[in-house]
UniProtKB/Swiss-Prot annotation:
<dbReference type="InterPro" id="IPR050508">
    <property type="entry name" value="Methyltransf_Superfamily"/>
</dbReference>
<dbReference type="InterPro" id="IPR029063">
    <property type="entry name" value="SAM-dependent_MTases_sf"/>
</dbReference>
<keyword id="KW-0489">Methyltransferase</keyword>
<protein>
    <recommendedName>
        <fullName>Uncharacterized methyltransferase sll0829</fullName>
        <ecNumber>2.1.1.-</ecNumber>
    </recommendedName>
</protein>
<keyword id="KW-0808">Transferase</keyword>
<dbReference type="GO" id="GO:0032259">
    <property type="term" value="P:methylation"/>
</dbReference>
<dbReference type="InterPro" id="IPR041698">
    <property type="entry name" value="Methyltransf_25"/>
</dbReference>
<dbReference type="Pfam" id="PF13649">
    <property type="entry name" value="Methyltransf_25"/>
</dbReference>
<dbReference type="GO" id="GO:0008168">
    <property type="term" value="F:methyltransferase activity"/>
</dbReference>
<comment type="similarity">
    <text>Belongs to the methyltransferase superfamily.</text>
</comment>
Length: 212
């Protein structure tokens, strides 16, 4: 059943949009959802931002509003085609999140929105290491993704959602301590906040590295 609904959500943009709207109601809607990982970040013109796994540009638009130079990366040419229409002021690169085609210390901020739960544990490790590599010293990795609920009332809706639209990797992520993985890769978590009964996590982590 998950395969059918996942296929529909990727094949038909209106299905994906509907699911996104419904899934973000518990944090105040899509706009609020996409702003959560960016709170208290001073993004400004002159900075360079990577929107990792940007999809159709749903979050890219909020990054672009800052006036920063925004690059969106995604593995899907179809998704990138939609992103170019939705957010033409950004530039786009087709590539894999676990094999970032960028140089050392190229970005001030790397952002990703509900993408890490699509990755295997090995891919997740590679992504975190790659993000650390492409960030400038002191650069920020900002993310929002699924989390194991702390309030039992949120288990049924999360389980239904994951059963319909997600795969085993989503279950693996909610049982993974992202903070520890980030720490091991050379980050310091400067902010972590849980929303929707603990079913969503927002993390901002600073890259600890020196200028070469």
């Amino acid at each position: 059943m998950a395969t059918i609904f996942r296929t529909w959500s990727y094949q038909y943009p209106w299905v994906y949009a509907l699911v996104s709207r419904l899934a973000t109601l518990n944090v105040g809607g899509e706009e609020r959802f996409h702003q959560l990982p960016l709170e208290n970040l001073a993004i400004s013109p002159g900075q360079k931002v990577l929107d990792l796994c940007c999809g159709g540009g749903q979050a890219t638009v909020y990054l672009a509003q800052s006036g920063a130079t925004v690059v969106g990366l995604d593995a899907s040419p179809k998704a990138l085609g939609r992103a170019k229409i939705n957010v033409p002021q950004a530039t786009y690169v087709q590539g894999l999140a676990e094999d970032l085609p960028f140089g050392e210390g190229e970005f001030d901020l790397v952002h990703t929105s509900v993408a890490l739960h699509e990755m295997t544990p090995a891919q997740l490790q590679s992504i975190i290491s790659g993000v650390h590599r492409v960030l400038k010293p002191g650069g920020i990795f900002a993310l929002v993704d699924l989390h194991r609920p702390s309030n039992w009332l949120f288990w049924p809706p999360l389980a239904i959602f994951m059963g319909l639209f997600e795969t085993e990797t989503a279950w693996q992520l909610i049982n993974t301590d992202l903070g520890s993985l980030l720490d091991q890769a050379g980050f310091t978590v400067v902010r972590k906040h849980l929303y929707a009964g603990g079913s969503l996590q927002v993390i901002q982590a600073r890259a600890n590295k020196t200028v070469n």
